[in-house]
Amino acid sequence: MAKAWNVPGLLQDATFRDAAGRVVVTRWREMMSFRDGTLAGEDIEQLHAMRVSSRRLRAAMDAFAGAFPGKSFRTHLRVIKEITDTLGAARDLDVAVDGLEAVVRDFADIERPGIEALVAEYRTHRAAEATHIAALFTRLDEAHFGQRFERWVARHTGVDPGGLQTQPEDH
């Protein structure tokens, strides 16, 4: 699992709003850093890391809900939940396929065709989920959601996202 990014400039005496801005933007960027790998679909761990990061973002938003107006907060949180849920549906299928492939050799020859058919069905569903993920991110891109999200955070917390040098911990 991907390690959570450090939050740049988060000081012990930070105001609630300053901390909210820094943490939420960092978690957003952390999640989005896995986007290309998730869309490529070549490594299921990219999707897993993106989903874990989306859950971190949701937790951060819940923790800092008081820094944002209720109606716009709910609107933005709903989009983040949609991302998490969409990724979760694909992740569940990845886990199921991995699990079945790991044990299929342990079954009697007579049982294997049924398991292999189930794996094939899950792969078909997983391909459909990949299409849903791509469509979701296309829609978010067309709506400029990422830029709007960061501006919304800045407007309500005073934190300038452009000044945050967010990156994975190993950099």
Q: What are these language model-derived features?
A:
Residues 1-171:
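Cationic, histidine-enriched alpha-helical/coil surfaces that engage anionic ligands
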